[in-house]
Swiss-Prot record:
TM segment ranges: none
Active site (record annotation): H56, D101
Native source organism of the sequence: Mus musculus
Name used for this protein in its record: Putative inactive serine protease 58
A single MF term (Gene Ontology): serine-type endopeptidase activity
Family: Belongs to the peptidase S1 family.
Catalytic activity: Preferential cleavage: Arg-|-Xaa, Lys-|-Xaa
Signal peptide coordinates: 1-17
SUPFAM superfamilies: Trypsin-like serine proteases (SSF50494)
Any matching Pfam family: Trypsin
Keyword Thylakoid recorded: no
Disulfide cysteine pairs (residue numbers): C41-C57, C133-C201, C165-C180, C191-C215
């Protein structure tokens, strides 16, 4: 009975916007679907040869897919699949922690600039509190969560202060290497989404999702690795490999 209720509620929520800034069905050109033999993750194209995602992603037999809106549809057009050469975890990442939760993927070939594949800009400064950001990832249909996600969605939410974030997540150490994006308090609606969603503010990548108690597509507060604070590692890794 509970499962049937969640299925009906999920269908209704997918029909109507979760908030006035909800968008569905369009793939941001920097967004990458990371398909594997485990759970998928969301990635971001930051260079024609490089994708960034969260280090907590487990990606055996990885496929890097660009331009996809519905991973459950094998007939979707304008999809580009790329092999990868090597994966680089941040050297300080620990599975038991949400700190330093970043991973770089070097592709085997350069991705050509197109309408559905374009590298996002990296930040030159820290993102400000109250900045408006777009958070994008794929959602599952709660009527059958055993299938691939079938709905690409974007929600527009704001960066919150460290104080607000620490109040929302008292059990976590919210460091200067993190940003938090979302609405306090969260909505806690039933949901299942692909992890490692990016926070892109004014066309610039500022965060990669490490953790959320709920779903970021429901505007729940997410804790993100702050891309600005990891630029030295990102740039050194790309330069030396």
């Amino acid at each position: 009975m509970k499962l049937a209720f969640l299925c009906i509620l999920s269908t209704l929520l997918r029909t109507f916007a979760y908030n006035p800034d909800h968008i569905a069905g369009t793939t941001p050109p920097y967004l990458v679907y990371l398909k594997s033999d485990y759970l998928p993750c969301t990635g971001v194209l930051i260079h024609p040869l490089w994708v960034i995602t969260a280090a907590h992603c487990n990606l055996p037999n990885l496929q890097v897919i660009l331009g996809i809106t519905n991973p459950a549809d094998p007939m979707e057009r304008d999809v580009e699949v790329s092999d990868y050469e090597k994966i680089f975890h941040h050297p300080n990442f620990l599975v038991s922690s949400i700190s330093h939760d970043l991973l770089l993927i070097k592709l085997k070939r350069r991705i050509k600039h197109s309408n559905y594949a374009k590298a996002v800009k990296l930040p030159q400064h820290i993102v400000s509190v109250n900045a408006m950001c777009s958070v994008s990832t794929w959602a599952y249909n709660l009527c059958d969560v055993t299938k691939d996600p079938d709905s690409l969605q974007t929600v527009n939410v704001t960066v919150i202060s460290k104080a607000e974030c620490r109040n929302a997540y008292k059990a976590f150490d919210i460091t200067e290497n993190m940003i938090c994006v979302g609405i306090v308090p969260g909505r806690r609606l039933p949901c299942k989404e692909v992890t490692a969603a990016p926070a892109v503010c004014n066309g610039v990548l500022y965060g990669i999702l490490s953790y959320a108690d709920g779903c970021v597509l429901r505007a729940d507060v997410g804790i993100y690795a702050s891309i600005f604070h990891y630029l030295p590692w990102i740039e050194d890794t790309m330069k030396n490999n």
